[in-house]
Amino acid sequence: KVYFAGKSEHYHIPLGHDFPGYGLIEWAKALGIPNATHNNTRGYITRLLERRLIAAANGLDPDDPAVDQVLVAREPGVLSCVINLETGSLAVEAALKMMLSRFYEIDGKAVPYAGRIPVFLVIADNAGGLTGNYHGTTVVAQTLRGLWPDFTEKAEGAGLYKVVSVPINDEAAFREAIRTWNQAPYKTAGFCHEIILMNYGGIRLTPEYLRAAYQACRDSDTPVLCDEIQSCAWYDGLFLFRKYGLTPDFVSAGKGFGGGCYPASRILASGAFDSLTQFGALVTNGQEELASLAYLITMAFIQANGEHIEAVGRAFHRGAAELTARHPAVCAGVEGDAHMTALRFLSVEDAAAFCAAMNRRCVDISAQTYKPNCPPVALTKLPLITTETMVGRLLALFDEELTALEGAKEAKV
């Protein structure tokens, strides 16, 4: 049987399994290029990748002389630095450390907000709790989404830091949170967000909401982390924040860029907040040369096929929206965007039954049912090599199973 990787093996293979382009990695090995480098240096390939990531993050061609000016910039909202790590959790943790370093000394240097209590703003769930966000598996990142509640309570009680959730797509509530938590003894340490909440129903934050939030953050000296671990390498231009016209201070990148070949995440940062010393940011395997080559291969493919990627993504999301509208007995619409589209169901049972049926038909998608306040959805993340013909076939299979699901429900009435 032929299986369709409808979630790209949890976002790792934008170009599918065994993409021929990654054969260049074997050629590099044959030429004697090693993967490992000394852990406080970077090889030529990694340095080249850093330049190209910064260029892409700023909407520039890597050969544009303007990239050299960006690399020395130290302004909020201008991404000019790359810290090479290994996993997305470490990338996000680096951003959190840089946010906290404005409140607590790392190496004896004075900090701008000494004595204030740092407050992290994160996206709320539909009940106002913390489970709407997901920023990795380190301890502090897990407290942002409601894990370690006793630990978090003690940290807050001791005045170490506080976590506050902000409602989804509510501009007024965000501005009020900024106003409230910038009064002594508190100070907003940062706003952490994804653009598409793939761990919470595939809900998409709107461009209007995010632009308003970014402006409120800029006005209050609050750095912004745009967590693109799951959305990077899935859009023309490589980063979804570019399509929104956003200017984050930190961007996490990983998963898709490595094409499933190597774990190799990075944090892109504004030089204005790059406060970690060399050994405060170092990860032994972060600078691997062949991992960087995998990034460059993925980026070259996406940049050469941007129009196709955009067209297929639009066709899939539009087709999914039309499809759910034809099945109102079980569907409530769509969430997400382009290849990262989620079908929203009226019940958890329907979402689970639909995904089970699609799995039997050799399509790998899954129902998100493990969070009590999360909308029941079937999540997809199609590989970028998906064609419009494949989208048509996939939607036809969806239609058949939704029709069968509606029929089964009617038979029970």
List where the protein language model places each region:
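PLP-dependent aspartate aminotransferase-fold enzymes
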Residues: 12-15, 22, 52-193, 207-208
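Glycine-rich phosphate-binding segment of PLP-dependent enzymes
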Residues: 3, 7-63, 80-82, 297
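Conserved PLP-binding catalytic core of the aspartate aminotransferase-like
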Residues: 313-317, 327-359, 376, 384-388
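Active-site PLP attachment segment
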Residues: 245-276, 287-294
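Structural motif of enzymes handling amino- and sulfur-group chemistry
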Residues: 285-308, 312
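Active-site core of PLP-dependent enzymes with the aminotransferase class I/II
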Residues: 176, 196-220, 280, 383
